[in-house]
UniProtKB/Swiss-Prot annotation:
Lineage: Bacteria, Pseudomonadati, Pseudomonadota, Betaproteobacteria, Burkholderiales
Name of this protein: Small ribosomal subunit protein bS20
Region named Disordered: 1-29
Similarity section: Belongs to the bacterial ribosomal protein bS20 family.
Keyword vocabulary terms for this entry: Ribonucleoprotein, Ribosomal protein, RNA-binding, rRNA-binding
Species whose genome carries this gene: Janthinobacterium sp. (strain Marseille)
Length: 87
């Protein structure tokens, strides 16, 4: 239990930050799923377009340190490899 005013405020802020970060991670997962779905459909043009949008999302979330930069790089690398294999 938070005893000081500062600790109580930090606890309130942590709840808000956790909700925001969870939302951002959900957005990341949705973007990755969209690329996977486009690749499975076999439409290379659509998959490439969705891939570019997802890379932007991944980079933005990594820049905010919601996920680690290496995890972002791993996501982008695996999606790019899957897209390349579609050709």
């Amino acid at each position: 239990m938070a005893n000081t005013a500062q600790a109580r405020k930090r606890a309130r802020q942590a709840v808000k930050q956790n909700a925001h970060n969870s939302s951002q991670r959900s957005t990341l997962r949705t973007a990755v799923k969209a690329v996977r779905k486009a690749i499975e459909a076999g439409d290379k043009a659509a998959a490439a377009q969705v891939f570019l949008a997802s890379v932007s999302t991944i980079d933005r979330i990594a820049d905010k340190k919601i996920i680690h930069k290496n995890k972002a790089a791993r996501h982008k690398s695996r999606l790019a490899a899957a897209l390349k294999a579609l050709a």
